[in-house]
Amino acid sequence: MTIETLTSLKLSFFILGFILFFFLETKYSNRAWKTRRYKRLLFHSTIALFNTVIMRLPVLFILMPMLLLVAENQFGLLYLVADYNIIKFIISFLILDIAMYWWHRFNHKNQFLWRFHFVHHVDTHMDVGTSLRFHIGELILSTLYKSVIILFFGITLAEFLFYEIILVLSVQFHHSNIRINDRFDASLSKFIVTPKYHTNHHTRVRKSREANYASIFTIWDKIF
């Protein structure tokens, strides 16, 4: 499977996920809409389009070379403990999720990083469009961070893109304005990030905002 095929696969899941969660939050809204939805959709889509165009450069010249280096040389810490198999695949997924937990946390604790991440937190009325609202500076820096993780641990293209697909769907889900039964949400949030779980992170109250950093698995918030 080529890089182009895997990248197209990620884009397909991104589009399908966005359409799905947009439909679900339209039909089963949890909170009343404070602004016209088409304005929010247009604004966030414009940000996403701009970011997508600009991000082609760091992805092409930084991220992809790291992934190719790992693939060609089987370079990285995980190759010392496991060959390419299901065990390495699972470990790589968990490492990436832990890495994203710490990246998110760094964005809140470091004043320089917070200047970029604050753009995402300006939107306190979350919907699936909020998952598109990121400063280009944060995306570039996160690409550099991911590249270091990939090279150090020896994460392959397939492992990375699989995680990215699940991450995109998770971010779309837990930013969406979907009404979920409280009991079911409480059970689900013991394992993965849900809209209600992540809503607390988007309040203007700093104490609430400095928690719930997880991207997929909520266990990292409990451990760290």
Region roles according to the model:
Residues 23-42:
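Membrane-interface helix-loop junction between the first two transmembrane segments
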Residues 13-23, 63-65, 135:
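Hydrophobic core of alpha-helical transmembrane segments in multi-pass integral membrane proteins
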Residues 3-7, 34-39, 78-85, 119-120:
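Helix-boundary and loop/linker segments of multi-pass membrane transporters
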